């Protein structure tokens, strides 16, 4: 149900926060950020950026800048007049590589 989805989103957001702490604004971080943000937007979250900022432990302005960078570097497409966007092949590949690597969650 909805709680399950929300829990997954919160987990992903927290994981993004850990990546940011450990690696800075790295490829896995931007991919994770884009993916979590897209899920939030798809859920119809009214304020995905503040929610994301809370999970990551940074200010919304900072997270907004990171999302801009994620779009610029090709992790997330821009959809005019709509929150969210589509994840790109690059994002999928980076996340897959991360999850399958030693510092992933297995």
Predicted feature locations:
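Short, Lys/Arg-enriched anionic-surface-contact patches
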Residues: 16-36
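Alpha-helical DNA-recognition elements
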Residues: 69, 73
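Short Lys/Arg-enriched helix C-cap and helix-to-coil transition segments
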Residues: 77-93
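Short, amphipathic alpha-helical interaction segments positioned at domain boundaries
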Residues: 93-106
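DNA-contacting interfaces and partner/effector-binding or oligomerization modules
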Residues: 1-7
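Short, charged amphipathic recognition helices of the HTH superfamily
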Residues: 40-54, 74
């Amino acid at each position: 149900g909805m709680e399950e989805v929300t829990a997954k989103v919160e987990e992903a957001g927290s994981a993004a926060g850990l990546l940011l702490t450990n690696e800075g604004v790295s490829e896995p971080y931007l991919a994770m950020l884009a993916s979590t943000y897209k899920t939030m937007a798809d859920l119809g979250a009214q304020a995905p950026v503040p929610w994301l900022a809370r999970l990551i432990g940074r200010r919304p302005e900072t997270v907004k800048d990171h999302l801009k960078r994620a779009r610029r570097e090709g992790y997330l497409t821009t959809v005019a007049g709509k929150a969210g966007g589509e994840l790109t092949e690059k994002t999928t590949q980076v996340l897959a590589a991360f999850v399958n690597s030693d510092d992933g969650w297995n």
